């Protein structure tokens, strides 16, 4: 026993020295309080608090009362442990930020999808999963005697489901309305002639009348104070062809020679009509007596006919057309257009 006691002294001394060394390396309470438990250091190290135990080499039969005060203090002492790595607080904070940002993005995407669905559905269309509060009756406790009412209520709740098919029917109706009319009826072409076609037909008719020499719808009659004149026997519409002023088509040089010869005989009269065509002066000489009626139409400043040039294959023809609607029985008149002093002195009726 005495030998065992002697051997325990060096072991106790060694344990006390080890506890003192650990206590010297551990920070004091002031440092722990100032930094705070679990607070990260500035160099990126995390600090953890823990408890250190010094297992003694003493015999287990010895009680704690025989331990030195230094051993008891160090057995429950708290100290800080350094852990190399990134701060855990920063890692947790970044994870929370990513989670929050993901939730915000998902919520914004859901809101945009809902807006698009609302725009397609229209302002008056109900949501597909939304039940109308007016159609849904308030829930009341039902008893065994109210089973018929419960069945009727269930049928009433099923009615809105039938109403959901109405938009489909409307959509089908719209597609039917958008069909073309030509799908049901053939395309009809207008039988009315265009303005160009009418003008072409009228021109061909005038060509035939000029070339054939037909003069219809008029006759020769004696007019008081004028002599012979032409009377309409049918109605002429405005712009309609009446008659051609037919005669010899000559140039200005030949016309002057003939006019000098006609002036020698006062009973001959003047039946020469001058006009310009393609910047050149021509004359229609109708002095020679023929059965054509155009040369016998008298003069008037307020006539119902007017002259017009009509070419056939490059050859000009002088024709008379109705300047207004002409009734049957009216005398055909047109303005000669000669206002020279010599002509008025020779033919005073040119004033009227």
UniProtKB/Swiss-Prot annotation:
| GO CC term (a single one) | nucleus
Q: Where in the cell is it found?
A: Nucleus; Chromosome
A single Gene Ontology MF term assigned here is: histone H4K20 monomethyltransferase activity
Q: Which reaction does it catalyse?
A: L-lysyl(20)-[histone H4] + S-adenosyl-L-methionine = N(6)-methyl-L-lysyl(20)-[histone H4] + S-adenosyl-L-homocysteine + H(+); L-lysyl-[protein] + S-adenosyl-L-methionine = N(6)-methyl-L-lysyl-[protein] + S-adenosyl-L-homocysteine + H(+)
The reply to whether 4Fe-4S figures as a keyword in the UniProt entry is no
Coarse class of the primary localization is nucleus
Binding annotation for S-adenosyl-L-methionine: 226-228, 271, 298-299
Q: Where is the composition biased (Basic and acidic residues)?
A: 109-121
Annotated positions of the Phosphoserine modification: 59
Region annotation Disordered: where it falls in the sequence: 21-51, 87-202
Which positions carry Phosphothreonine? 140
What function does this protein fulfil? Protein-lysine N-methyltransferase that monomethylates both histones and non-histone proteins. Specifically monomethylates 'Lys-20' of histone H4 (H4K20me1). H4K20me1 is enriched during mitosis and represents a specific tag for epigenetic transcriptional repression. Mainly functions in euchromatin regions, thereby playing a central role in the silencing of euchromatic genes. Required for cell proliferation, probably by contributing to the maintenance of proper higher-order structure of DNA during mitosis. Involved in chromosome condensation and proper cytokinesis.
PANTHER family reported for this sequence: N-LYSINE METHYLTRANSFERASE KMT5A
Name of the protein: N-lysine methyltransferase KMT5A
- Please name the source species: Bos taurus
């Amino acid at each position: 026993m005495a030998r065992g006691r002697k051997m325990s002294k060096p072991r106790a001394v060694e344990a006390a020295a080890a506890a003192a060394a650990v206590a010297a390396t551990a920070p004091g309470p002031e440092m722990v309080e100032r930094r705070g438990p679990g607070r990260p250091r500035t160099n990126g190290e995390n600090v953890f608090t823990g408890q250190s135990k010094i297992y003694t080499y003493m015999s287990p039969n010895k009680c704690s009362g025989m331990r030195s005060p230094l051993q008891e203090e160090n057995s429950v002492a708290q100290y800080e442990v350094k852990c190399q790595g990134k701060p855990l607080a920063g890692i947790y904070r970044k994870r929370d930020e990513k989670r929050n940002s993901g939730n915000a993005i998902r919520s914004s995407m859901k809101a945009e999808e809902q807006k698009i669905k609302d725009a397609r559905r229209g302002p008056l269309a109900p949501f597909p999963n939304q039940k109308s509060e007016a159609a849904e009756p308030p829930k009341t406790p039902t008893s065994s005697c109210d089973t018929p009412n419960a069945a009727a209520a269930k049928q009433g709740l099923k009615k809105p489901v039938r109403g959901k098919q109405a938009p489909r029917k409307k959509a089908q109706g719209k597609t039917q309305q958008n069909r073309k009319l030509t799908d049901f009826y053939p395309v009809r072409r207008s039988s009315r002639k265009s303005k160009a076609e009418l003008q072409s037909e009228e021109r061909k008719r005038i060509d035939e009348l000029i070339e054939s020499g037909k003069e219809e719808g008029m006759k020769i009659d004696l007019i008081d104070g004028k002599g012979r004149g032409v009377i309409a026997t049918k109605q002429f519409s405005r712009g309609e062809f009446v008659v051609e002023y037919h005669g010899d088509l000559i140039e200005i040089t030949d016309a002057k020679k003939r006019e000098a010869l006609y002036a020698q005989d006062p009973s001959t009269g003047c039946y020469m009509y001058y006009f310009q065509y393609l910047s050149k002066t021509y004359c229609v000489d109708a002095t020679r007596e023929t059965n054509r009626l155009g040369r016998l139409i008298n003069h008037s400043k307020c006539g119902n006919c007017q002259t017009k040039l009509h070419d056939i294959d490059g050859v000009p023809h002088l024709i008379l057309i109705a300047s207004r609607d002409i009734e049957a029985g009216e005398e055909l008149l047109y303005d000669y257009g000669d206002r020279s002093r010599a002509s008025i002195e020779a033919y005073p009726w040119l004033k009227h």
